[in-house]
Amino acid sequence: MEAMDLPCIARLRNGKSATLALAEASDSAELLKFYRAMSEEDRLVLKDDVTTAEWLDGFLEALRQGEAISVVGKLDGEIRGEATLYRTLHGWARHVGEIRLNVDRSARGQGLGLELAHPLVKLAIDRGIDKLVAHMVDSQVAAKRTFEKLGFHKEAELPGHVKDIHGKKHDLLIYANDVSHIWSAMEAMLGDFRPDRATR
């Protein structure tokens, strides 16, 4: 999938339409609003403090440098989900990408996360990425279920590797799979509930 395929309209399971688009600098204020509105529970173990201007500056720079590609999902004109593909452009892990996915609680369970991840997996294939990984902690039960449905499986568990914003330690779970397997699983899932797709 090339950038020209976005924005597009995705039909969710509840019949609503979400607009998917590549994140741009013009989305800065909305992205901060989205992340600052997340509950502390949801932000507790995120890899970065996504509520700060410093994080946003670094995120936008990663987009400019091609080290990250982000897709935002909007419902009723407001961001309700965001997914990012991170990659290393040089070195021995340049064939590996990392996906991070966050969906507002009000929009969960309707397939928005799948719709956000789908174009990123296609972009990973187009850019020669062979393997995708996702990091989460042991308490993120919903995240584990989501990534398992997307075709990921647990490859490693690192005890006490993550310290949350309150200083409590958590086990880090590393989920991964070959991009081709993830793509096949996602296509099968999308075929179950998305008979068509409208683009604009």
Question: How would you label these PLM feature ranges?
Answer:
Residues 48-95, 100-106, 117, 178-180:
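Acetyl-CoA-dependent GNAT
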Residues 16-18, 76-82, 170:
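Glycine-rich phosphate/pyrophosphate-binding loop shared by adenosine-nucleotide-utilizing enzymes
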Residues 110, 114-115, 138-157:
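Conserved active-site alpha-helix within GNAT-family acetyltransferase domains
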Residues 1-14:
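Short acidic N-proximal helix/loop "leader" segments that mark the beginning
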Residues 18-30, 178:
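A short beta-loop-alpha structural element at the N-terminal edge
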Residues 33-47:
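Helix-loop element at the rim of GNAT/NAT acetyltransferase active sites that forms part
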